[in-house]
Amino acid sequence: YEIHERLVGSEMCIRDSIAALLRKEYPECEVVLKKIVTKGDRILDVPLAQIGGKGLFTKEIEEDLLDGTVDLAVHSLKDMPTVLPEGLCLTAITERANVGDAFVSNKYATFEELPLGSVVGTSSLRRKAQLLAKRPDLEIRDLRGNVDTRLRKLDEGLYDAIILAAAGLERLGHGDRISSLIPADVCLPAVGQGALAIEARTADKEVRDMLSFLNDLNTKQATDAERAFLGLLEGGCQVPIGVHADVEGENIRIEAIIAALDGSTILRDTINGKADDAVSLGQQLGKKMLAAGGQEILASIL
């Protein structure tokens, strides 16, 4: 089986990849990695929000899936559009790793310690809006490139701190660079953050069945709720929307924010219910927040 993974500098660690898990589960199968640089990875001199379009980190990979070049694709779920191309499906969602955002600094231990006017690096509008809502004095500068590049820019003194997904740092062996985790009441994570998604052709039942062992039910229910919320708002990964669903037994709690780009307005709400109703609860929360002012916030952005 041939698998696509994004090639992002030195970031793809084969020992931690889905390929390694497949080889262990099915030692009789040959697993071949095909790597690709996507549009979102190639264009590094323009902020993601200005590139435009959805699927910046998935389009080229999905084209190879559809034409049969590869059998499955591995994505960070947070990069996946809520609507997939016809003929493709998410066949497994792995157990979620650390869902939070990491505060990384060589000078300060926590976000709260940053002095007035500190320079903070992030390429995420979601993070920028929420950080400015708490600290409008901060100077938020765009930060692109792979994880190694971003850490190097911090070490060169271009930023006082940078914000990265904690799961990504930990997967790549950079967990020791995390100064602290940013609390959810300061910065709610992105849809699907911390989970890996396995995409395959809908008609390829054999491959989909083989991948079922990778699926984590709690993570799937939580991320289904988050993606349902995002899908109802029709927001891509470059809109200031944060949402986190937490499954405890049979119950689920979903918390979400819709923010203005400058953080001047943030709408926050939660909903609770049964985990089996994850999708409908995510949609309910989306409708409620749109009616409460979210529509106006999004209209000012889109």
PLM-predicted stretches and their roles:
Residues 1-7, 13-14:
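Single conserved hydrophobic/aromatic residue that forms the stacking wall/gate
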Residues 36-41, 53-61, 141-153:
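Short helix-initiation/N-cap motifs at beta->coil->alpha
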Residues 37, 76-80, 164-169:
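Beta->alpha turn/N-cap motifs
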Residues 45-71:
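Short, structured active-site "lid" loops
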Residues 70-74, 160-161:
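Short, Asp-centered acidic motifs that coordinate Mg2+ and/or phosphate
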Residues 77-78, 86-138:
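A conserved helix-loop-strand patch within extracytoplasmic ligand-binding domains
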Residues 141-225:
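Pocket-lining segment of extracytoplasmic ligand-binding domains
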Residues 220-289:
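A C-terminal functional module that forms or caps the active site or interfaces directly
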